[in-house]
Structure formats: C-alpha cells, structure tokens
C-alpha cells in the first residue's frame, strides 16, 4: 500500500509543533545559562566556523575554537560571519562564551526556504565554486541556475567540471566547447579530476586566495574534492545511485576550514535543487550578464523576450552576440521559476 502524502496543513502543523519544541528547549537553555557581566571577559573578534541550532563555534585570532551561545537579540548567525564575542571565565554546560554582535557582511549566499522565506547559508564569500560533473550528465541549465544566484549575490563564480577522467577524447572536446560558452562571456572555468588529480593544483591555487564555497548537485564529487584538498577532513564521498543517478547527501552541516596552502573553504551540504522562486523575472534577466547591454532596447517595456516584435535580446541571439543555449536556458528558468513558486519545493 502506497504511503499517504502529508497535506500542506499537516506539514505546517508538524513544522509549528517542531518550532515550538525548539523554542521551549531554547528558552530552557537560556534560563540555565544566564551569562552575567562578571562571568565574561573582554570583547574580542572572531569568525563563525560552524553554526548549530542554538550555538555556534567561534574561532579567535589565535586559531582556537570556542562553542558559544548567541545573545537573544541576534538572529541568523551563519558560517563566515565576523563577530564580536566574549569568553566566559569558566565553561557552563560545555559552552565557553557568548556572541555579542555580528559585523556587517560584505555579501551573503541565500536560498529560498519554504517556511522561513529567504535563508542565508553563509557570508563573506570571495568566490563560489560551481561544481559540475559529466555523470550523470553535464547540465548547462543547472550551471546557469547557479550563475544567476552568483550574479544576484554579487559573488564571483568559478565553473569547475569534475570527473573528466571518465571522458573520451571526443567527449572531452565537446565538454570544452560547452565550457567555452561561459569563458566567452568572462567566466572562469576549470576541468579537473579528483580521482586522478588532473589540474587539482590549479584548483588549490585558486582556493588559496580568500574564502570559497562549493555548490553543486549531489553526486558531482564535492566531497571527493574536499577529501583531495584536505585529506584529514572526514567528508564521506557520496556514491551515485545506479538507479536514480543522484548521490546521497553525506555532509550534514556547513563548516569553515583553513586550507594548508592558505585560504578558507566553506564546506556545505550538497544542494540538489536551488530554487529561484524568490527572484522575479527582472532579477533573473539581469542575472545573465551578457543580457545587460541590451536591456532597455526592446520596442516594448514589458517585452517577454519571446516572440515580441523588435526584441533586443532575440536580435542579439540572431546576430551571434548572445549564445542560443544561454537564451533557451533563460526561458527555461523563467518557466520553471513560476512552476517552482507554486510548489516551493527543493531539497538540501
């Protein structure tokens, strides 16, 4: 007998009851750990390296990590946040201190959340590494989806194609041509193999500059890359299901790591679907960087860039100034956004 699916009202009640239970536990914890001024040292700078439901691990200037409570006035503290915190003179129930404030962020990576609206995943990022793979298939549509997120967040992306050791010479040449679409509009691309180590030195050199974060569908080899870059980190490799072709999610929480060669890496749970329903059509359009030069030049202000007469974008495609694959993917994203908005479904 097939398992009956939960209705939306049932899902909301479950979420509400769970939130109430967490809130009760949070309030009980706060009652138990009541930090007084004479129990705390001076304020100091720190960076959040891991965030849990009610606590966060903060690293000080000396590289020591302390588990901290959050002040009641703080909300949405995420990995990468630069914070002001105070260490307790003694540990209380395994808690070493308290985060007092979060410094202004230079940027943040967010995703839409069914219950909470827009949820920030990490902050203060220097580049987003979009990891794709040749198996189960190289999807330029998914790459474009991530690029729209990067452009909207104003975070530079790098497109990395993993598992190239599985490609024949002909397939490799075809993949090169597909990535050339992105190089021609100014994006950096890299073809690597975590299995054989091909071009891994180029990736590690790139990661040595600032803070990076990996994004990509499950099964593209993000955990394998982390293991290759930092063998000491126990990031289990996701195995691709022979039936579905989708990997199992193995990383459970976001964490910031310091790389041996320099730089920082935020390792986050694999993202299978990255919803765009929080963006309107205009934001998605501007998320295609090569479109921007032609925006505002259409005959009609409400041009949908389909069969509208004198559409500047369509004319640019016909003139070879915009790649037709990118233009087709754009319309697919617009259509899927409306469908996803009605369902508001995606998996982490």
From Swiss-Prot:
Annotated binding of GTP, by residue: 162-165, 216-224
Compartments it resides in: Cytoplasm
UniProt GO BP: ribosomal small subunit biogenesis
UniProt cross-references to Pfam families, sorted A to Z: RsgA_GTPase
Keywords tagged on the record: Cytoplasm, GTP-binding, Hydrolase, Metal-binding, Nucleotide-binding, Ribosome biogenesis, RNA-binding, rRNA-binding, Zinc
Binding residues annotated for Zn(2+), in chain numbering: 298, 303, 305, 311
Swiss-Prot/TrEMBL cofactor(s): Zn(2+)
Domain (CP-type G) ranges: 106-274
Keyword Protein transport set for record: no
InterPro entries on file: G_CP_dom, NA-bd_OB-fold, P-loop_NTPase, Ribosome_biogen_GTPase_RsgA, RsgA_GTPase_dom
Annotated function: One of several proteins that assist in the late maturation steps of the functional core of the 30S ribosomal subunit. Helps release RbfA from mature subunits. May play a role in the assembly of ribosomal proteins into the subunit. Circularly permuted GTPase that catalyzes slow GTP hydrolysis, GTPase activity is stimulated by the 30S ribosomal subunit.
Full protein name: Small ribosomal subunit biogenesis GTPase RsgA
């Amino acid at each position: 007998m097939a398992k009956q699916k939960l209705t939306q009202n049932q899902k909301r009640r479950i979420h509400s009851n769970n939130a109430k239970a967490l809130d009760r536990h949070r309030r009980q914890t706060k009652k138990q750990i009541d930090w007084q001024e004479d129990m705390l040292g001076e304020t100091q700078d720190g960076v959040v390296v891991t965030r849990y439901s009610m606590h966060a691990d903060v690293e000080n200037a000396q590289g020591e990590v302390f588990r901290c409570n959050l002040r009641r006035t703080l909300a949405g503290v995420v990995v990468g946040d630069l914070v002001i915190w105070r260490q307790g003179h003694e540990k209380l129930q395994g808690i070493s201190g308290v985060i007092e404030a979060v410094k202004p962020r230079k940027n943040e990576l967010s995703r839409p959340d069914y219950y909470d609206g827009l949820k920030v995943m990490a902050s203060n990022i220097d580049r987003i590494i979009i990891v794709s793979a040749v198996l189960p298939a190289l999807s330029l549509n998914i790459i474009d989806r991530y690029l729209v997120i990067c452009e909207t967040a104003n975070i530079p992306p790098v497109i990395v194609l993993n598992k190239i050791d599985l490609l024949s010479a002909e397939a490799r040449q075809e993949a090169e041509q597909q990535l050339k679409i992105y190089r021609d509009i100014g994006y950096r691309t890299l073809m690597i193999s975590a299995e054989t180590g091909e071009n891994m030195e180029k990736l590690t050199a790139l990661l040595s500059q600032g803070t990076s974060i990996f994004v990509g569908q499950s099964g593209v080899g993000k955990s394998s890359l982390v293991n290759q870059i930092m063998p000491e980190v126990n990031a289990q490799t996701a195995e691709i299901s022979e039936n579905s072709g989708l990997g199992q999610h193995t990383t459970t929480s976001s964490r910031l790591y310091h790389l041996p060669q320099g730089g920082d890496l935020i390792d986050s749970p694999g993202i299978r679907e990255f919803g765009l329903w929080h963006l309107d059509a205009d934001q998605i359009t501007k998320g295609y960087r090569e479109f921007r030069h032609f925006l505002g030049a259409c005959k009609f202000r409400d041009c949908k860039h389909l069969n509208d007469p004198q559409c500047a974008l369509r004319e640019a495609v016909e003139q070879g100034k915009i790649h037709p694959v990118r233009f087709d993917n754009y319309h697919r994203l617009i259509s899927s956004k409306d469908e996803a908005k009605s369902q508001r479904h995606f998996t982490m």
